[in-house]
Amino acid sequence: KIEAVFCDTGWEHPETYQHISDVCKQLDVKLVVLRSKKYTDFVDMSIKRSRFPSSQRRFCTSELKIKPMIDYILSLTEPCVIIQGIRAKESEERAKLPYECNYFGEYYERIKKNRKGKIVEVWKQDYRRKDVLKWCEHYDASVSRPIFQWSAQEVINHILSAGQKPNPLYSRGFSRVGCYPCIMCRKQEVKLISQEEFGRNRLIDAEQRMKEETPKGSSFFSPGYIPNRFCKNRTYPTVQEVFEY
């Protein structure tokens, strides 16, 4: 019994949604789409938190992907194996991940945090902790990362050899095809987005909504993304200023 599980942030490119649907149909695999129960999408989440996520505060991943996935697993009444297409070379943090693990392993780990100047020990993960521990008494959620040591080219080669096609955004120069755009996107990708009406308008509209619907507003891009001299306020850039840069 195989299911493809997609955590929809509501911030993907239309071609990504189509690609996911096409692949599942071609492989005759059931597609399960998960969404946050708390937020409508990425922009709604950002507005309700009065800021966009950043490299230092990536709450988008936990709120729009991790929590919906946890909710889904807890709805299952049988053990499962979660296959993740994560590669070690994608980032330093991902390189630290094991090849295989227990999906809920972090619920049994303690970490130290600084809270108001005091170091305290807390559980590494505590979302629905009681529900998770109860579920784990009866079932198991194992994680396997079969392409963990592969190169990007090996992944593409494998997709092509299976008669499939990669996400079309890769052929257009994008290195990230999750959120469109990701808060971690490179300047070259921003340049590509600025040349496409859909992407350009989406970013401008999101930032405008943030300005209109929150007390202080917030820029999509963090301070320092471009040199301060190109920012009207000399601190952080607007989307339009980044496009012009």
Residue ranges and their predicted role:
Residues K1-Y245:
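Nucleotide-activated chemistry modules centered on ATP-dependent adenylation/adenylyltransferase
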